[in-house]
Curated annotation (Swiss-Prot):
This is Unknown protein from spot 360 of 2D-PAGE of etiolated coleoptile. On the 2D-gel the determined pI of this unknown protein is: 5.7, its MW is: 41.1 kDa. It comes from Zea mays (Maize). It comes from the Eukaryota.
Amino acid sequence: SIXEPLALSVFDEP
């Protein structure tokens, strides 16, 4: 996700 850290984007919503 854009609003979150890159690391979170890995296992979060696309």
